[in-house]
Structures are given as C-alpha cells and as structure tokens.
Design a protein with these regions (language model features):
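Short glycine-rich or small-residue beta-strand-to-loop segments that form or flank ligand, phosphate
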Residues: 10, 41-45, 76-81, 297
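Short amphipathic alpha-helical face segments that pack within enzyme cores
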Residues: 39, 93-97, 289, 293-296
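Active-site cofactor/substrate anionic-group-binding motifs, chiefly glycine-
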Residues: 48-112
Length: 343
C-alpha cells in the first residue's frame, strides 16, 4: 500500500474513491503487510468509512473475483449479516421462494460468522450444493435459475485480509463489503444491513458502483432483514435516483408480527424449519416474515408490481408445494432439471 494513502487514512482524513481503489488493489493482491493492513482498517473504522471508500474497496475486490459469466438479469438477496439476533435465515428462504417463481437468483453468501447459522450452513444442511465452481454456478443459474455463490470460493483475495480481521476482532469496512461483491454481476439486489448508518453507506456505495435497482433495508430494533414487528427503513435505488421511506406490516398486507416469530437455531433446526415452511405447515409468523422479504425481492426483480402482490405470490409458493418441489430439484442437483418442471 502506498505510504501516503496509509498516512492519510491514519491522520483521519477521507480517501477519494481512487485512493481507496488503489489501497484495495494492494490488499487484494497481498502486497500489504499485516501490520499496515490492520492500521489502515482500524483507521477507517475509527473515523468512520465513507461511501466513496467503500465503493473503491469494492471495485478493487471485484477485479480480483474468480471469473464467471455475468448474469445481469439475476438478483441477489445477500445482506451483511452481523446483527447478532440469531434469527432464522429469512433472506435465504426468500431467495429460494423467489427462484421457485421463475426469477433467476445468484445468492451470494458465506458460513456463519456471528450468527448461529449462515446461508451456506442452512443450504448445505438442506441438501443444496454450496461449494460449486464458477462453471458449476453458471450451469445451475442457466438450468435451474438458482445458484449459491460461496464467498470463499469466489473471493480468494479475501484470504489476504482474513488473518488481520480475525486479529482485530472488530467490525471493519469488510463487514459491509459482501453485498457489493456478487460474482455474477447482478444489477438488482435486496440488501439487509445491520445498522441504519451502515445501510446508508451500502446504498450510496451501490449507487456509485452503478446498481440498476436495489432496496437496502434495516429492520427497526437492529435487524438486517425486513421485519413485521416494527418499521423497516428502506433506501430505494433506481437508475441512480435514491429515495428513503419506511414500511410497516400494512404495506405488505400482513398482520403485525413478534420478534420471537423470527427465532432460529443451528443449521439442523433451521433446515427443519425451512422444510416445514415449504410444506405449508411452518409457523405462521415466520412464514409471513419470509413472504415479506420475498416480496421485496419480487418487487426488485419486476416480477411483482406491488408488495402485496409479491406477498401473495410468495405465500402461494410456500403453501402450494411449489417452493418445496423447487427445493427438491436443487437437492437432486440434476443439471437437466428446468424450472418448468416445478410449475
């Protein structure tokens, strides 16, 4: 890393996007000593990262991603995680529901870091392939309309900063980068963020990186998902325009929920809950929460014009068996299975 960039960061001064890009390239290439990497990340965190810095770092690590064919019409529901709530994997379940309805989903994610069960942990326990190569992901997206993009498989450059992040043991810019690094080049996203301030940063960075449409959400009470027991803070990005608003249960056409509706456990417990939901017999409050998050993704994809329409589609997918049949097709990992077969 260039000494003048490190010195500027340590002096508490903001970096330009170009300087952050330069620093990110050095980090991604493993050219920065661990001590300097730690000083850089700690300095940004102490002062507070800017959207320009986040976008610059993201651009650098996008350059270092394991290459795969772009799927710009696909969507992603990858969030930051890190809310510490140990809830059920709402965004992962919602991604499967949305994919069962014919929307191509390139689900970016990882194993658990601060939660009891990460997206990769849940899907693996549910029998869905999670550790495929880029070519495997391309094939699954083309044939089945869903692929899990396991972050460590697609971002080998992250290994250069992983020891530093573990040693620091505190949040850094990298806790916000995940949703900005989808390897499939998606242009439409729903991103849950663990704090209101983080949501603003992620939204502004997504806009700077040229996202076509995104909903960045923060659930009141500290949730990185849409919730039904409080307001959902939404930052809506469309074609470069950014708007902010709140959503409540009535906007989804659903009754108010309770925090305990979202309770999850380890991978075994959450996989069992997923099966129950997709068999139409899961806890009603949890099913409503999954439907609300799926509705956001259906809206972003253009599949549903209104949130209430999206909720109806999602509820039907879960109660009719459509989502269950789609999940079974993923478990079979039959590359010849097409979505038409689960219609």
């Amino acid at each position: 890393m260039r000494k003048e960039i490190l010195a500027k960061a340590m002096a508490g001064r903001r970096l330009t996007a170009e300087e952050a890009l330069d620093a990110g390239r050095s980090l991604a290439a493993g050219r920065t000593e661990h001590l300097h990497c730690a000083a850089f990340l700690a300095a940004l965190a102490a002062r507070g990262e800017t959207a320009e810095e986040l976008a610059g770092l993201a651009a650098a690590f996008r350059e270092a991603v394991s290459p795969m064919r772009a799927f710009p019409d696909a969507i992603d529901t990858c969030g930051t995680g890190g809310d510490g709530r140990h809830t059920f994997n709402l965004s992962t379940a919602a991604a499967l529901v949305v994919a069962s309805l014919g929307v191509t989903v390139a689900k970016h994610g990882n194993r658990s870091v601060s939660s009891s069960c990460g997206s990769a942990d849940l899907l693996e326990r549910a029998g869905v392939p999670v550790d495929g190569s880029p070519s495997d992901a391309e094939e699954r997206l083309t044939r089945q309309g869903f692929a899990f993009l396991f972050a460590p498989r697609f971002h080998p450059a992250m290994a250069h900063v992983a020891p530093v992040r573990r040693a620091l043991g505190a949040r850094t810019a990298f806790n916000l980068l995940g949703p900005l690094l989808n390897p499939a080049g998606v242009r439409r996203q729903v991103v849950g963020v663990f704090s209101k301030e983080g949501a603003v940063l992620v939204a502004d960075a997504l806009a700077a990186l040229g996202v076509e449409r995104a909903l960045v959400v923060f659930g009141e009470g500290g949730y990185d998902e849409a919730v039904l027991h409080g307001r959902v803070h939404v930052i809506d990005i469309e074609g470069g325009d950014i708007s902010r608003y709140h959503l409540g249960p009535s906007d989804f056409g659903l009754p108010p929920g309770r925090p305990e509706d979202l309770a999850g456990g380890g991978s075994e417990e959450n996989a069992a809950l997923l099966d129950e939901l997709f068999e139409g017999r899961g806890p009603r409050g949890l099913r409503h929460a999954v439907a609300a998050n799926a509705a956001l993704a259906l809206s972003v994809s253009g599949k549903a014009g209104e949130l209430r329409e999206g909720v109806g589609l999602a509820e039907d997918a879960m109660t009719s068996g459509r989502a269950r049949r789609f999940l079974e097709s993923l478990r079979a990992d039959d590359m010849g299975v097409r979505r038409a077969q689960v219609s």
